[in-house]
Amino acid sequence: MNPEVFREYDVRGIVDRDLNPEFVYLLGLAIGTYALRHNVRQMTLGRDCRLSSEAYHDIVGRGIRATGVDIIDIGLCATPMLYFSIRHFQADGGIMITGSHNPPDFNGFKICIGPDTIYGDQIQELRRIIESSSFATGEGTDRQEDITSTYQDYLFRHVDIK
């Protein structure tokens, strides 16, 4: 595990080098464990259109569910839609898989507890959980939801462009 993937505001690295399937699964276990320690029982999960995002989405979701956290899978979406989904579904948090503005060989994970993105020492706690292998165990559920039209309706009702 490359400790440098645990950045200030996200977990980010180079696809297949830093972010391989084994690491992404362990990250899912760490996110689920961290979430449960903060009374999070349900999280939304979204991804961008990068080539690696779909596979990472499936793997990290499997890890999170293995801790007992339930997933609301919103699939392919923009990052603001992930934030919207947390409030819309009254979820306890969310995870967005996105490379953001970084080069195509990068990808990353933005993690929210409640509506707030974790950062700093909170991100480092994920690393410590992986290093100690002290993961929660359980059986979380997974349900698919499409929020695209709901998000668009919300924007049309609340954004006034003149």
Where do the language-model regions lie?
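Short, surface-exposed linear patches
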Residues: 27-30, 65-68, 94, 116-120, ...
